UniProtKB/Swiss-Prot annotation:
Phylogenetic lineage: Eukaryota, Metazoa, Chordata, Craniata, Vertebrata
Record's protein name: Coiled-coil domain-containing protein 32
Function: Regulates clathrin-mediated endocytsois of cargos such as transferrin probably through the association and modulation of adaptor protein complex 2 (AP-2). Has a role in ciliogenesis and is required for proper cephalic and left/right axis development.
Keyword presence, tRNA-binding: no
Species: Danio rerio
Subcellular location: Membrane, Coated pit
């Protein structure tokens, strides 16, 4: 059983108890009248038990060489945890480029002065409108020619006799084939 008779044991100091429990530890240093003497400064390499408040070759505090990198890493980790990452993903980059392209085309298509800058002497207004329509068809209004084409009935519904001609494929390149672009 582990119960000892407490009356037979004499009172021992904490240092004795610790040295008994941890026999591999070095002997405790002698205390100076119970006063606290550690200055939290590194001791000199020649004398590891220096009790002087200032060591002879004391150097002022300097940050470690990699402390800036370490702090930057911690800040990046904190931003990532908060969802404020500063790293640009490919999706964000593509979205940004797409938005810039859209804004640039909007300025080109809707700003008359900018459009005139790209015009040469022989570049007429209809060619510019055609170019704009080719670049961004959903943003340019249809012209009278296109409206007329959309409102006219198709060739197939005009005459039943012509439908037999359109059913056979065009064999030669010189022969005109009906197409929606014409």
């Amino acid at each position: 059983m582990m119960i000892d008779d407490f009356e037979t044991h004499a009172a021992r100091s904490s240092g004795d108890l610790w040295s008994e429990v941890c026999s591999s530890l070095p002997e405790p240093r002698e205390q100076h009248g119970g006063q606290f003497t550690d200055s939290f400064e590194p001791s000199s390499p020649g004398d590891p038990h220096t009790d002087s408040p200032r060591a002879a070759n004391f150097s002022p505090w300097e940050p470690m060489a990699d402390s800036e990198v370490y702090i930057a890493g911690l800040e990046n980790r904190l931003k990532r945890i908060k969802g404020q990452t500063s790293e640009v993903t490919s999706r964000e980059m593509l979205r940004s480029l797409s938005q810039a392209k859209k804004e640039c085309w909007d300025r080109f298509l809707h700003d008359a002065q900018t459009s005139e800058l790209f015009q040469e002497g022989n570049f007429d207004q209809s060619a510019l409108e055609q170019f704009k329509r080719w670049l961004s068809p959903e943003r340019v209004a249809i012209n009278a020619e296109e409206l007329e084409y959309l409102l006219l009935p198709t060739q197939n519904s005009e005459t039943p006799a012509s439908s037999s001609q359109t059913d056979k494929p065009c064999v030669e390149e010189e022969e005109e084939c009906p197409s929606p672009e014409k």
